[in-house]
Amino acid sequence: YCIFSLQHTGEKKSISNQYWASSISEAAKIAEDLDSKRIDAYYAIADYKKEVYEKYKKGERKNLRIAENACRFSTLSYDIDVGKVKNSYAELPEALKELRRVVEDNDLPMPLIVGSGSGVHIHYCLEAPIEKEQWLSLAGRLKVLFINAGLVIDPVVSTDASRVLRIVGTHNYKKGGKVPVRIIAEGDGSHTY
């Protein structure tokens, strides 16, 4: 598991790091520690090749969380922004209403919805990890469906194999605030594809 941190140090300046964990509990502990220090914590949506973890353990600290090192995925994830100037919904209720409309109009299962502090992340959790090629195909097709249905999503997030997203139970410290990252709706559970 890869945990990514982003510490805001001033106007448009930040320090980023990545941490590798061998278990969910170890990853959670890293995230809790970062959050207690008012540092934004994210998790990588991909599982990475074994060699990546071995390099990290040997002290290689360069950015190993890159798309070419990603191999398996357990979620299809999408980002809906709120309150930004463009490609965004004005308010959270409007974003959630539009998401519900698109899901219902297309007979999709309701996704897990996470309030990120500045929008929502939606996740279709998979019952078992899938390989990158299958993930890219599924994520891309669902992205096209969302866009064609009029849902305003960040088009890059959904097929970015090196993407990191905020961790539920931590906080969004962007812009000097402390907004909880929380589950808004649990959705219809995990899915098989």
Where are the regions a protein language model picked out?
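Residue microenvironments linked to proteolytic maturation
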Residues: 154, 158, 164, 174
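Catalytic micro-motifs at enzyme active sites that drive phosphoryl/nucleotidyl and oxygen chemistry
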Residues: 60-68, 99-115, 152-157
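Helical (often loop-to-helix) elements that flank the catalytic cores of nucleotide-handling enzymes
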Residues: 86-105, 126-153, 173-193
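DNA replication initiation on ssDNA origins
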Residues: 1-75, 80-89, 163, 169-178, ...
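Conserved short beta-strand edge segments in small beta-sheet-based binding/regulatory domains
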Residues: 42-47, 147-159
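Histidine-centered divalent-metal-coordination microenvironment in nucleic-acid enzymes
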Residues: 75-78, 103, 109-137, 162-172
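Alpha-helical context
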Residues: 54-58, 122, 143
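Residue-level "edge-of-site" marker
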Residues: 2-4, 116, 159
